[in-house]
């Protein structure tokens, strides 16, 4: 199943981005076949990362000064959706690692030079949860901590690590510290039930000096005073963090729903139900009702998720501000997209029969991966709905992720 809306090619960058999407389409059969290998390895196979690099996926949100396309973010997320439909872990890691090129573009030029100066294909992993801190020292910060859940960390040579800035024993700022691989270790601890192939291991840092230019405050991102905006002026870099980050988490999950749907329909088309006197599943009217309901919810999840991103980007291209109402709607629909996707996968999985429990059955893998993705903080529906509800009554948002 493919989404009901096609991708428009509005400019030369979009045409190039479309060629990246075409390249992704060519890779999908291989990525699907490697899904079990990714789980066994507990990280994405090296060949897959190399192939994504080759087709230009990681260039989609990278600044043009580094050979990137700095394209319409809906095209990036469309690529993520397609990858997630082939392998949940691959969609997850590609989304997170891919969006980091957008994040790095907001850092001071000196930081970008240090990461990409010798090789613009260098990748950055992350763990934004505040599991460590940076103490103010002369010229920068002394950082220590142990950051869990750094997806794709084995394929990166730098890391964004989130946490507070401490001065005189008190937090005075909050943001991301950018640290090279030579100054942190990775603890291999990723033994999990879902998203097994993401290699979301723990990054450990002890008393590492981080210069000022390699720290970016979330406040600077939100009020558009980030140093990187002086050199990277494309509209995509003005997108709100509160839209970009949560969408990065939801897009692969909706992709998993598309993958689960396709796997379910293919399976049902061949399935004979022994419990019902050899009835062919495709002749069961109730089976058709279930797939129709699932298809509708999955399409609507994607339409709303990507539609809000497109609406925000269209305003930025016109030089206009994004109203808070739209940002609140984007968060509302982002968590709703995750919920719709997972409930659709549940509906399909429950109707797939006992053979769906086999390790080589794609439906069970998508089911596990989607539920694993749901536990990410960006998918907590109550907080996002509260932002929207408060705004409807003229009350403050009480949350920063918007």
Regions picked out by a protein language model, each given a short descriptive name:
Residues 79, 143-145, 205, 257, ...:
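Buried hydrophobic positions in well-ordered alpha/beta secondary-structure cores of metabolic enzymes
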Residues 200-298:
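Glycine-rich beta->alpha junctions and the first turn(s) of the following alpha-helix
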């Amino acid at each position: 199943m493919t989404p009901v809306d096609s991708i428009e090619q509005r400019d030369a960058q979009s045409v190039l981005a479309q060629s990246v999407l075409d390249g992704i389409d060519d890779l999908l059969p291989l990525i699907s076949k490697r899904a079990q290998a990714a789980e066994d390895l507990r990280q994405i196979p090296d060949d897959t990362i190399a192939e994504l690099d080759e087709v230009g996926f990681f260039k989609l949100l990278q600044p043009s000064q580094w050979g990137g396309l700095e394209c319409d973010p809906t095209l990036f997320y469309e690529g993520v959706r397609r990858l997630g439909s082939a392998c949940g872990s691959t969609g997850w890691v590609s989304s997170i690692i891919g969006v980091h090129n957008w994040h790095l573009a907001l850092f001071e030029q000196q930081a970008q030079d240090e990461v990409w100066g010798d090789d613009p294909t260098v990748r950055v992993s992350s763990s934004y949860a505040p599991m460590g801190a940076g103490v103010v020292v002369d010229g920068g910060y002394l950082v220590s901590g142990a950051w869990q859940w750094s997806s794709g960390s084995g394929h990166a040579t730098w890391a964004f690590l989130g946490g507070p800035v401490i001065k005189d024993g008190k937090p005075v700022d909050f943001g991301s510290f950018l640290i090279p691989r030579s100054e942190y270790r990775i603890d291999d601890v990723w033994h999990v039930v879902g998203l097994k192939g993401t290699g979301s291991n723990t990054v450990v840092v002890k008393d590492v000096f981080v210069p000022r230019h390699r720290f970016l405050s979330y406040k600077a991102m939100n009020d558009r005073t980030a140093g990187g905006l002086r050199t990277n002026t494309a509209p995509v870099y003005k997108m709100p963090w509160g839209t970009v980050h949560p969408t990065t988490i939801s897009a692969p999950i909706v992709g998993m729903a598309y993958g689960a749907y396709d796997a379910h329909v293919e399976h049902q088309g061949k399935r004979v139900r022994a419990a019902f006197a050899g009835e062919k599943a495709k002749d069961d009217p109730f089976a058709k009702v279930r797939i129709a309901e699932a298809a509708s919810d999955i399409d609507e999840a994607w339409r709303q998720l990507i539609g809000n991103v497109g609406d925000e980007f269209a305003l930025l291209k016109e030089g206009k501000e994004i109203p808070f109402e739209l940002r609140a709607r984007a968060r509302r629909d982002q968590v709703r997209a995750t919920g719709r996707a997972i409930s659709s996968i549940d509906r399909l999985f429950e109707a797939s029969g006992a053979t769906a429990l086999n390790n080589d059955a794609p439906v069970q893998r998508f089911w596990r991966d989607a539920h694993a993705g749901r536990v990410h903080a960006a998918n907590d529906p109550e907080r996002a709905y509260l932002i929207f509800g408060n705004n409807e009554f003229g009350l403050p948002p009480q949350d920063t992720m918007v």
